[in-house]
Regions:
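Conserved aromatic-histidine-acidic binding/catalytic patches
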Residues: 10-18, 65, 90-94
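Charged, often glycine-rich, active-site loop that binds/positions anionic groups
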Residues: 46-65
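Domain-level recognition of nuclease-like catalytic cores that cleave nucleotide substrates
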Residues: 119-167
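Hydrophobic, Leu/Ile/Phe/Ala-enriched alpha-helical segments that form helix-helix packing faces
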Residues: 25-37, 105-113, 143-146, 164
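Interdomain/boundary linker segments immediately adjacent to catalytic/signaling cores
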Residues: 1-44
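Active-site beta-strand-loop-beta-strand hairpin of nuclease catalytic cores
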Residues: 67-82
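Short glycine/proline-rich turn/loop motifs
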Residues: 7, 83-89
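Catalytic cores of nucleic-acid endonucleases
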Residues: 87-134
Length: 167
């Protein structure tokens, strides 16, 4: 928490206008690691049926609550890489809700791959912060439930830097 406060926000509260600071830092790290531009995207997963579509405003739809947050980034090379960035620090109800929503989002990624075995999509979930680190084992356990685990990365920025070429 202190590192994020000092390094990413220059000592300022990270809310409002600076709430994207952590995501922007993670995006920059991915671009430095891969040497590729990580473009923003409006792609979302439907949490009920594991379909995917470009959707900028799910709140205008009757099924608005069935849609995930959008993926934070996309890199297309030989495969299509969809990135999800999270930095969760501290403890409390907000952090617990974020982690729970994230769990269902990542679980849906596995179902999407299972339902679309010929897709060239690889999901990259970069999860930083002390709260994420403490719960990362729950997400690793999730990988053991699906044979599609080789097409989903779950880990922090440092682990991604070490292993990104495997994906």
């Amino acid at each position: 928490k202190d590192w994020r406060h000092k390094t990413l926000s220059k000592g300022k509260f990270m809310g409002g206008a600076s709430s994207m600071t952590a995501e922007n830092w993670q995006r920059l790290c991915v671009e430095q690691i891969t040497g590729k531009k990580c473009e923003k995207t409006n792609l979302r997963l439907n949490l009920d049926n594991a379909t995917m579509m470009e959707l900028t405003r799910p709140s205008t739809r009757d099924d608005e609550l069935d849609w995930s947050e959008d993926f934070d980034g996309r890199i297309v090379n030989k495969k299509e890489y969809l990135y999800n960035f999270k930095m969760v620090i501290g403890t409390g109800g907000g952090q617990t809700r974020t982690i729970r929503e994230l769990y269902h989002f990542i679980k849906c990624q596995f179902v999407f791959l299972k339902d679309n075995p010929d897709t060239e999509i690889v999901f990259i979930n970069i999860l930083d912060g002390d709260s994420m680190s403490a719960k990362l084992h729950r997400f690793i356990e999730l990988k053991t439930k699906f044979s599609e685990h080789a097409r989903i990365f779950i880990g922090d920025t440092k682990t991604y830097q070490k292993n990104w070429k495997k994906y």
